[in-house]
Amino acid sequence: MPIEIRRFGVGHRRPDGPPGTVGIEGRVLESRAAGSITELAFGRSAHMAPHSNPRWTCFLVIEGGGWTGVGDERTRVLAGEAVIWPPDVLHAAWTEGTPMRAIVVELAEDPRLLAASRAGDGAAAGAAPRPVSKGEGRLADRPHRRRAGDDGQGEPD
């Protein structure tokens, strides 16, 4: 199967969100019965109108920060944080003075149960984790292979 590339980001978004949403653009990257993946870009003072959907939703903030609400709770959320919105519960997200980017993953199944089943222990959500021994190892050495004329290309040293 060939590699499939899906572009997102600036130039690939369109206005997105439920009715009443202001200042948000997005790009659906994948959508099927099992779930969907969407990139959202919130401008300054943007807001996603409170809404619910029948799927579990993981709201993964990848840049900037803003606010999220689930039911009656409200909290600040920053890049590197993920919020789990349960199905059929009102949820929203918004920004004030700064923009925010997020990846939204909607799943037909509870992601906490998926993680437990992938770990092989079949533990229910909220169960105590199994103790594991400390891993040993290190990253493999990567030889430095800079070619003449490559000074301005790629990642910094």
Residue locations for each model-derived region?
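Ligand-binding loop in jelly-roll beta-barrel domains
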Residues: P87-L113
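A short, N-terminal "cap"/entry segment at the start of jelly-roll beta-barrel domains
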Residues: M1-G35, V83, A115-D157
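Short beta-strand His + acidic residue motifs that chelate non-heme Fe in jelly-roll/DSBH
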Residues: M48-P50, T68-G69, W85, H91-G97
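Glycine- and acidic-residue-biased ligand/ion/polar-headgroup-sensing regions
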Residues: R55-G66, G71
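Short acidic-glycine-tyrosine-enriched beta hairpin
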Residues: D72-P87
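Conserved short histidine dyad/triad with adjacent acidic residue
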Residues: S36-N53
